[in-house]
Curated annotation (Swiss-Prot):
4-imidazolone-5-propanoate binds at residues 82, 145, 178, 246, 323. CDD domains: Imidazolone-5PH. The gene is hutI. PANTHER family: IMIDAZOLONEPROPIONASE (PTHR42752), IMIDAZOLONEPROPIONASE-RELATED (PTHR42752:SF1). It comes from Bradyrhizobium diazoefficiens (strain JCM 10833 / BCRC 13528 / IAM 13628 / NBRC 14792 / USDA 110). This is Imidazolonepropionase. Its cofactor is Zn(2+); Fe(3+).
Length: 404
């Protein structure tokens, strides 16, 4: 009796992105079969049973299929609008001047605290829709603009709600240690006490976070303060991530590695020792060219060092109101190639396989292979390099999430 599937996509070219295959894992004459939302077969059409049946067969007319895209670092949920600050900066105002005038992250925190969960969801939906419209099937969303227990949890609840309102997998990260709230009066240690003793336990009890993130930087939190957050997270059974070495080298990459972090992100100032430590720990480097571009950074992340040591590299939008108002993984790939000199294969892996790796969900998505969710992006392109090469162009033909 012939095997029956829910859907079969045939007459397709596949970029499987499997790590055990060279380059993009291309299959020129490929086919994908799915059942129950999962891939059952992804491979050469010639090796697939000719008598296989399906409820629906889709002729892809020679189009390319990649895994659905993964944006592994975003701050999609927030209140307010900081476009006016962009205008001020173009007129010569510094970050410090804007902050003293009540702008910067303080303004986003104030607006986020005032917003209801429904308002946060409504403002984030267009940003999420933009990512979905370019083939994203998994999106990570951080808190970090509440800086008090109530608002941080409201941000995370809003992120979870987005996943119920759209066909997309949402992964949430608690980023309570993002900045110091105004009411802390400059006392970082006291605020970290609040994060570790009140916020994190409440977030964990509510099941609102898949991971815990921290911003370790001179303008944010120290290595010791970060370690306290990570130790608390570990005690609660939550994996960790780190905003590391963006503006200076405080040893963030090495600290992330010490705690076996899923990822260390930004990394413009990471040194050789940090890269080696990340490789040994299996911590993914998440590169964020949108922020590099938007704040006109000049120090590039050490891509050659990451290659040398075998550090896995992901790319993400870092969508946020202050330093990367970017909602395009296609543009993030072009920036990764143009600004960081990443290869086409590295860029495509960065928003598929390695993005999933950075979220700890590589066993579920990120490549085209049997057993994973049937998350696909089908493209009107002649070759996969076009996804990285072209600017301001969206060749997505169809997006498939969990087989639908």
């Amino acid at each position: 009796m012939a095997e029956r599937f829910d859907r079969i996509w045939h007459n397709a070219r596949l970029a499987t992105m499997r790590a055990d295959r060279p380059d993009l894992g291309e299959i020129e004459h490929g086919l994908i079969a799915a059942r129950g939302g999962h891939i059952v077969y992804a491979g050469a059409a010639a090796d697939f049973p000719a008598d296989a049946d399906a409820i629906k067969r889709i002729d892809c007319a020679g189009r390319w299929i990649t895994p659905g895209l993964v944006d592994c670092h975003t701050h999609l949920v927030y209140g307010g609008n900081r476009a006016h600050e962009f205008e001020l900066r173009l007129k010569g105002a510094s970050y410090e001047e804007i902050a003293r005038a009540g702008g910067g992250i303080v303004s986003t925190v104030a607006a986020t605290r005032k917003a209801s969960e429904a308002e946060l969801v409504a403002s984030a939906l267009p940003r999420l829709d933009a990512l979905i419209g370019e083939g994203a099937t998994t999106v990570e969303i951080k808190s970090g603009y509440g800086l008090d227990a109530e608002t941080e949890m409201r941000q995370l609840a809003a992120a979870r709600s987005l996943g119920r309102q759209r066909p997309v997998a949402i992964r949430t990260s608690f980023l309570g240690a993002h900045a110091l709230p105004p009411e802390a009066d400059g006392d970082k240690d006291r605020y970290i006490d609040l994060v570790c003793k009140e916020m994190l336990p409440a977030v964990a009890k509510a099941g609102l976070a898949d991971a815990v993130d921290t911003f370790m930087e001179g303008i944010a939190f120290s290595a010791g303060q970060t370690a306290r957050v990570f130790e608390t997270a570990r005690g609660l059974g939550l994996p960790v991530k780190l905003h590391a070495d963006q503006l200076s080298n405080l040893g963030g990459a090495a600290l992330a590695a010490k705690f076996s972090a899923l990822s260390a992100d930004h990394l413009e100032h990471t040194d050789e020792a940090g890269a080696a430590a990340m490789a040994k720990a299996g911590t993914v480097a998440v590169l964020l060219p949108g922020a590099f571009y938007f704040i006109r950074e000049t120090q590039k992340p050490p891509v050659e060092s990451f290659r040398k040591h075998g550090v896995h590299m992901a790319l993400a939008s870092d969508c946020n109101p202050g330093s990367s108002p970017l909602t395009s993984l296609l543009l993030a790939m072009n920036m990764g190639a143009t600004l960081f000199r990443m290869t086409v294969a590295e860029c495509l892996a960065g928003v598929t396989r390695e993005g999933a790796h950075a979220l700890g969900v590589l066993d579920e998505t990120g490549t085209l292979e049997a057993g994973k969710w049937c998350d696909l992006a089908i493209w009107d392109i002649e070759r996969p390099a076009e996804l990285v090469y072209r600017i301001g162009f969206n060749p997505l033909h169809r997006r498939v999430w969990r087989g639908q």
